[in-house]
């Protein structure tokens, strides 16, 4: 059967089985294992484990997925379900360590090295499953996904998330690192299971047949599963937005915990288990005098499973080769050339049909002035950005966070880069910031994610700007994720302290302090104060969120330790999982500071009470709170009106000309808002296309809705990032809106991938009503039509527009666009693109 004839049937079969879910998927686990290996530094005694794992990728990758091998009913009718279950827990690891130490003393031969690599893969799977499935933990990935997107139903989130993670992985990531053959140490597994159970519980044929099914399932995922992206994106915006970054059980967090368990496994292999505490939950293992974070509790995964049909088996030659102790499975190519050719041809034709081939509008800007990148993968360069004149030379400088930055032995410690501007603006050449940034600050806590948020203010009121940096995952090694904010004092010579002068911490577990930061005058003394948003903080419940402010003042001294519980001003969210503080914005209205706080997953549950069934509540309506501090009561609220819209995800303000009248306006983004598109006489729902509302701001009334903007593609997250700034020196602010997940083709991922766009609207050409709905073309909405510029992503699938900022020099005001998933310098490391608009 050819690959092309297989594809439609496979896609239908996978789609029909998706609602049943599956174990946390093959692709997801393989990606976690790949990332965990990237910065592993593990050379104990006579073994360099990183080199061993790199040499034996065939065994390592097979081991990563193996624990789920016997779950599906296609594997001998599911009779060995319990064997898979036992492979997820510490007793299996303990039995494996003792088996290897008793039978294969160092130095190891190649087959034993493969066994060790296979075991390391299994331990990655063990660690990842605990936080992904919330096994013995609160607020792991799937449990939070259930609370946000499935009315609190863990089982529904489990069903969608396990297989949806694979769909997302295949849609977003390049799996060109996947080994074309896998090795399973069958004879050794028989010995390990006999040691674990004290009797024979499984046969060689069962291990070979069921692990071969896994291998074929991986082939199926590589072939077609990414085409289900629209289905799973519709089901769960949380899955799409938080898959990599979520603090407990996101991809990066699971990779971090994989590296931790690798260190423990190597310790046990070389020293035995006598100096280890081995609770059943593998995330709580401790060796060598380390303290357990908590014993945790073992909970059965109780997975959903999909049954793959034998049609897949018929499509791939049964390439199985036995060795003395194991078996190899092989495939000539993971993605047949015929399929790649077909996809590319279809993509070209559809782009030509709907976009007009390669012709670009004159308003399109496809080439940046310069691009800045990093040479280390997964850094998330540009996750946070701010601009200020740090060295006090009269030119704006760029401050950029890379919270995912890692180097060997130091995972996700994070970095902050300072790039100084001059008469020409920012450096007009491409830069590797690790080599050419003017200043670098580096985090020092394991997986602390230093650089997740930034703010510049004169905190100690000495006339020199200081820098505040958020590190919301500090405490991840203890599973507390309390977070921290570090303040670096500036000097009159234009420099900055090399270590933090002030540390602000939080006592609550899962506080994630420092997720958002803002400089705004809270106490009315005309000096900006430090405002901290923690949307995942308990706030008296679960992820209600808090916003706290510390007043600036000369009494703040060097090396001071502050607790957020003692903040000068604090407000809290209304509901569990409402993420109050997800976005922050400050604006001066009639000489008073208006502080705006976004709570995008607010759902008005408190109003519903027990009058309505939980299924009747509207998920993630979103709400924005407006405060005139120091008053802690909100002056107004703006609430979303459509489920899953997430109003308040982004906020910005400025001055525009509205029908000839100068207006101070507030922009509020609802990036997952469902809008309606009209193509001639056909009406289509644009799921998660995104929308932005523009309000008039006054100090004595509720903001008045003036205009709306809408995206033109499903899932594009139009309005997910907003900014207003005067780009042409006419005294009016241009409106800048990003759609970082926009997909060029109208099939929303069936053919092409993300290309991201940023729209710039001139500040003197705004009108009342629907700005993007009155179109000359036969397709509405038309966000490009009224835009002055449309910035086109220079790189596909890079999340172009994931954040943006403007940097002003004496001569120009430049736009800096982050592409958080760019692979310009290294895989998914992120990049910054600099544009000079309106300054010719």
UniProtKB/Swiss-Prot annotation:
FG-GAP repeat residue intervals: 367-428, 436-497, 499-559, 563-623, 633-693, 704-770, 788-840
Main location: secreted
GO aspect biological process, one term: cellular response to pH
Catalyzed chemical reaction(s): a 6-(alpha-D-glucosaminyl)-1-(1,2-diacyl-sn-glycero-3-phospho)-1D-myo-inositol + H2O = 6-(alpha-D-glucosaminyl)-1D-myo-inositol + a 1,2-diacyl-sn-glycero-3-phosphate + H(+)
Molecular function in Gene Ontology: glycosylphosphatidylinositol phospholipase D activity; phospholipase D activity; sodium channel regulator activity
UniProt EC number: 3.1.4.50
Signal peptide, first to last residue: 1-23
Superkingdom per UniProt: Eukaryota
Pfam families for the chain: FG-GAP, Zn_dep_PLPC
A GO term from the CC aspect: extracellular region
Name recorded for this polypeptide: Phosphatidylinositol-glycan-specific phospholipase D
Summary of subunit composition and partner proteins: Monomer.
Broad enzyme group: hydrolase
Summary of the function given for this chain in its UniProt record: This protein hydrolyzes the inositol phosphate linkage in proteins anchored by phosphatidylinositol glycans (GPI-anchor) thus releasing these proteins from the membrane.
Similarity annotation: Belongs to the GPLD1 family.
Alphabetical UniProt keywords: Glycoprotein, Hydrolase, Lipid metabolism, Repeat, Secreted, Signal
Subcellular compartments: Secreted
Glycosylation sites noted in the Swiss-Prot or TrEMBL record: 94, 271, 292, 307, 321, 501, 568, 591, 604, 659
């Amino acid at each position: 059967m050819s690959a092309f004839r297989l594809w439609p049937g496979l896609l239908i079969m996978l789609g029909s089985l998706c609602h049943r879910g599956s174990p946390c998927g093959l692709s997801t686990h393989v990606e976690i294992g790949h990332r965990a290996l990237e910065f592993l530094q593990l050379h104990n005694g006579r073994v360099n484990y990183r080199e061993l794992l790199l040499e034996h990728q065939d065994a390592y990758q097979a081991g990563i997925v193996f624990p789920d091998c016997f779950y599906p009913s296609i594997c001998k009718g599911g009779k060995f379900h319990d064997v898979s279950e036992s492979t997820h827990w510490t007793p299996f690891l303990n039995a494996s360590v003792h088996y290897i130490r008793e039978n294969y003393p160092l130095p190891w031969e190649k087959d034993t090295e493969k066994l060790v690599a296979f075991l390391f893969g299994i331990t990655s799977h063990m660690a990842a499953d605990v936080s992904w499935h919330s096994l013995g933990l609160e607020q792991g990935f799937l449990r939070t996904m259930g609370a946000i997107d499935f009315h609190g139903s863990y089982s529904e989130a489990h069903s969608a998330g396990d297989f949806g993670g694979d769909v997302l992985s295949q849609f977003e990531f390049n799996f060109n690192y996947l080994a074309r053959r896998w090795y399973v140490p069958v004879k050794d597994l028989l010995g390990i299971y006999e040691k674990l159970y004290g009797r024979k519980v499984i046969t060689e044929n069962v291990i070979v047949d069921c692990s071969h099914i896994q291998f074929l399932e991986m082939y199926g995922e590589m072939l077609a599963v990414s085409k289900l992206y629209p289905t799973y994106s519709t089901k769960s915006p949380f899955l799409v937005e938080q898959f990599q970054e979520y603090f407990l059980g996101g991809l990066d967090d699971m990779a971090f915990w994989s590296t931790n368990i690798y260190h423990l496994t190597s310790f046990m292999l070389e020293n035995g288990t006598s100096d280890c505490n081995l609770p059943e939950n593998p995330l709580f293992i401790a060796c060598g005098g380390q303290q357990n974070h908590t014993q945790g509790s073992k909970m059965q995964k109780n997975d959903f499973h999909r049954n793959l049909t034998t049609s897949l088996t018929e499509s791939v030659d049964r390439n199985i080769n036995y060795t003395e102790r194991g078996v190899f499975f092989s495939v000539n190519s993971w993605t047949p050339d015929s399929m790649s050719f077909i996809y590319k041809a279809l993509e070209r034709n559809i782009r030509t049909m709907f976009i007009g081939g390669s012709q670009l509008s004159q308003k399109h800007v496809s080439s940046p002035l310069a691009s800045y990148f990093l040479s280390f993968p997964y850094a998330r360069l540009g996750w946070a950005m701010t601009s200020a004149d740090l060295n006090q030379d009269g030119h704006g400088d760029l401050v950029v966070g890379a919270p995912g930055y890692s180097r060997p032995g130091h995972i996700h410690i994070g970095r902050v880069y300072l790039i100084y501007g001059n008469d020409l603006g920012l450096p007009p050449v491409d830069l590797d910031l690790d080599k050419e940034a003017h200043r670098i600050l580096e985090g020092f806590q394991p997986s602390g994610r230093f650089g997740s948020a930034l703010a510049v203010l004169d905190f100690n009121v000495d006339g020199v700007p200081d820098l505040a940096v958020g590190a919301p995952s500090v405490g991840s090694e203890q599973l507390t994720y309390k977070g921290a904010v570090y303040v670096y004092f500036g000097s009159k010579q234009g420099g900055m302290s090399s270590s933090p002068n002030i540390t602000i911490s939080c006592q609550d577990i899962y506080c994630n302090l420092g997720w958002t930061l803002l400089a705004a005058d809270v106490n009315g003394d005309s000096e900006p104060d430090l405002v901290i948003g923690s949307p995942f903080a308990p706030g008296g419940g679960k992820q209600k969120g808090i916003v706290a402010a510390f007043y600036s003042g000369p009494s703040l001294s060097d090396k001071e330790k502050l607790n957020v519980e003692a903040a000068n001003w604090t407000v809290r969210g209304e509901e569990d999982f409402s993420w109050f503080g997800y976005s922050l914005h400050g604006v001066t209205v009639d000489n008073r500071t208006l502080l705006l706080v976004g709570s995008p997953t607010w759902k008005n549950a408190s109003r519903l009470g027990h009058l309505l069934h939980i299924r009747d509540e509207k998920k993630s309506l979103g709400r924005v709170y407006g405060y005139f501090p120091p008053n802690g009561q909100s002056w107004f609220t703006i609430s979303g009106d459509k489920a899953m819209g997430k109003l308040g995800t982004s906020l910005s303000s400025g001055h525009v000309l509205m029908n000839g009248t100068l207006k101070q306006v507030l922009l509020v983004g609802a990036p997952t808002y469902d809008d309606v598109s009209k193509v001639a006489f056909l009406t289509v729902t644009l799921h998660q296309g995104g929308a932005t509302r523009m309000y008039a701001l006054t100090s004595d009334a509720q903001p008045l809705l003036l205009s709306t903007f809408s995206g033109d593609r499903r899932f594009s997250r139009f309005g997910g990032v907003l900014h207003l700034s005067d780009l042409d020196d006419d005294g009016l602010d241009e409106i800048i809106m990003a759609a970082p997940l926009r997909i060029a083709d109208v099939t929303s991922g069936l053919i092409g991938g993300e290309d991201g766009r940023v729209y710039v609207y001139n500040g003197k050409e705004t009108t009342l009503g629907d700005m993007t709905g009155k179109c000359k073309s036969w397709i509405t909405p038309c966000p490009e039509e009224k835009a002055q510029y449309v910035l086109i992503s220079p790189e596909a699938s890079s999340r172009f527009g994931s954040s943006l900022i403007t940097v002003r020099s004496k001569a120009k005001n430049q736009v800096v666009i982050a592409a958080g998933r760019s692979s310009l310098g290294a895989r998914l490391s992120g990049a910054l693109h600099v544009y000079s608009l309106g300054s010719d």
